[in-house]
UniProtKB/Swiss-Prot annotation:
Membrane topology: Single-pass membrane protein
EC number: 2.4.1.17
Signal peptide extent: 1-29
Induction description: Induced in 3-methylcholanthrene-treated rats.
Name under which the protein is recorded: UDP-glucuronosyltransferase 1A1
Glycosylation sites per record: N89, N297, N435
GO process terms (BP): acute-phase response; animal organ regeneration; bilirubin conjugation; biphenyl catabolic process; cellular response to estradiol stimulus; cellular response to ethanol; cellular response to glucocorticoid stimulus; cellular response to hormone stimulus
A GO MF term: retinoic acid binding
Subcellular location: Endoplasmic reticulum membrane
Length: 535
């Protein structure tokens, strides 16, 4: 009987031991502070936070009281701080941005409008950051919480200021930063001869004029970005009680989690603390709801086209919406169009308007034939993951560059949403659906993207935990951060060697000149004196 009891106890203890060994250990659990940015930036970060919580870590998210997407969650603790603006102001800023892309104003007027909007929105966001940093009670409570690390999106460097104020190692979660601030802050080489600048629409194989364009953008982008980023340097200088620039704020980051992949991006140099996690938002596809399953099944052999211009575009001008509706009505596929604006009067029977759609799940369905997208990084990677050729209508920001990259890889067709006609959209859709090369190219990219030793989400979680365990990753920080600009480019060494060469040349020249005078100058004087004596 005792033998049986001992055997039963052993069997009961075995799962417990396995849980202790394989499960999250309380002794290794850490505390992570998260300072996100509202919108798609936050939505892409949620998977990492959820995984960290499931592994036993305590996650605290801080956000302004006026937030659209950042809400309470079951796998993190939410702490909100007061700001001098309301939810309506944030919503209005997003709506105005989506509406402005369809403006047909002259170029210079659009530039002025964009500049004023960027300045206005930046001022609002800066005021929110300032209210956080000047909230002494709130900041003191964060300091007393003894976090192990900070996870933030450096697109707005408020989290970077908090990290330095609390002396926390920082992990950055981003796609890219404007004006190549990410490359500058990481000291990452980016030769202008083959690394295209953001917003240039160049490829990595540039002709002479494209390289000239690349150089001009490089020379002017820092000036343009001062509107957004220089005030953060001034705010940080006040809070940290030392003179700092935005580059000084960003460069101490331990790890840069970049939502990039060389399947989409052109090959270029990267630094040891830059980790590529492109496709992290490509979640495992789920079963469709009855509503969407019915739409897909009703499409028959022709299949479906998924159409979304992102959450920022809530309304399209009537004339443009009717042109789009006309083009969609000319194809045999069923079109699922995510659109919250006014229903076009000429909407065809094959086009279904929905206020929301499970984009990744629909793209993962075997009947998905094409994807009409605004070329945001989320949509591009979901198109790659699921192997669906794209018709791209970039609207602003890095979307133009994303579309260019996919087009050069033969995975889609790009249209100018302002200039395109119904015929253009119809032809583009028929091209990517009927020309097999587009499907073959996107499937090849999908295969390359998925052929990796570790999933992007697991890789991101590993590096966040790594920084929490080791209190940073200083061994990955290059010494370039500690050099002056002339030391980095070895200008002092070049100057020193040049001085030596010039000195040697000068000495040799003087020696030769002296020798020539001795050899030839003396004979001349002797001959001259001899002639004078004969006379």
């Amino acid at each position: 009987m005792s033998v049986v009891c001992r055997s039963s106890c052993s069997l009961l203890l075995l799962p417990c031991l396995l849980l202790c060994v394989l499960g999250p250990s309380a002794s290794h659990a850490g505390k992570l502070l998260v300072i996100p940015i509202d919108g798609s930036h936050w939505l892409s970060m949620l998977g990492v936070i959820q995984q960290l919580q499931q592994k036993g870590h305590e996650v605290v998210v801080i956000a302004p009281e006026a937030s659209i997407h950042i809400k309470e969650g079951s796998f993190y603790t939410m702490r909100k701080y007061p700001v001098p603006f309301q939810n309506e102001n944030v919503t209005a800023a997003f709506v105005e941005l989506g509406r402005s892309v369809f403006d047909q104003d002259p170029f210079l007027l659009r530039v002025v409008k964009t500049y004023n909007k960027v300045k206005r929105d930046s001022s609002m966001l800066l005021s929110g950051c300032s209210h956080l940093l000047h909230n002494a009670e709130f900041m003191a409570s964060l300091e007393q919480s003894h976090f192990d690390a900070l996870l933030t999106d450096p697109f707005l460097p408020c989290g970077s200021i908090v990290a330095q104020y609390l002396s926390l190692p920082a992990v950055y979660f981003l796609n890219a930063l404007p004006c190549s601030l990410d490359l500058e802050a990481t000291q990452c080489p980016a030769p202008l001869s083959y690394v295209p600048k953001s917003l240039s629409s160049n490829t990595d194989r540039m002709n002479f004029l494209q390289r000239v364009k690349n150089m001009i953008i490089a020379l002017t982008e820092n000036f343009l970005c001062r509107v957004v980023y220089s005030p953060y340097g001034s705010l940080a200088t006040e809070i940290l009680q030392k003179e700092v620039t935005v580059k000084d704020l960003l460069s101490p980051a331990s790890i840069w989690l970049m939502r990039n992949d060389f399947v989409k991006d052109y090959p270029r140099p990267i630094m040891p603390n830059m980790v590529f996690i492109g496709g992290i938002n490509c979640l495992q596809k789920k079963a469709l709801s009855q509503e969407f399953e019915a739409y897909v099944n009703a499409s028959g052999e022709h299949g479906i086209v998924v159409f979304s211009l992102g959450s920022m575009v809530s309304e399209i001008p009537e004339k443009k919406a009717m042109e789009i509706a006309e083009a969609l009505g000319r194809i045999p596929q069923t079109v699922l169009w995510r659109y919250t604006g006014t229903r076009p009067s000429n909407l065809a029977k094959n086009t279904i308007l929905v206020k929301w759609l499970p984009q990744n799940d629909l793209l993962g369905h075997p009947k998905a034939r094409a994807f009409i997208t605004h070329s945001g990084s989320h949509g591009i990677y979901e198109g790659i993951c699921n192997g669906v050729p794209m018709v791209m209508m970039p609207l602003f920001g890095d979307q133009m560059d994303n579309a260019k990259r996919m087009e050069t890889r033969g995975a889609g067709v790009t249209l100018n949403v302002l200039e395109m006609t119904a015929d253009d959209l119809e032809n583009a859709l028929k091209t990517v659906i009927n020309n097999k090369s587009y499907k073959e190219n996107i499937m090849r990219l999908s295969s390359l993207h998925k052929d990796r030793p570790i999933e992007p989400l697991d890789l991101a979680v590993f590096w966040v935990e790594y920084v929490m365990r080791h209190k940073g990753a200083p061994h990955l920080r290059p010494a370039a951060h500690d050099l002056t600009w002339y030391q980095y480019h070895s200008l002092d060494v070049i100057g020193f060697l040049l001085a030596i060469v010039l000195t040697v040349v000068f000495i040799v020249y003087k020696s030769c000149a002296y020798g020539c005078r001795k050899c030839f100058g003396g004979k001349g004087r002797v001959k001259k004196s001899h002639k004078s004596k004969t006379h």
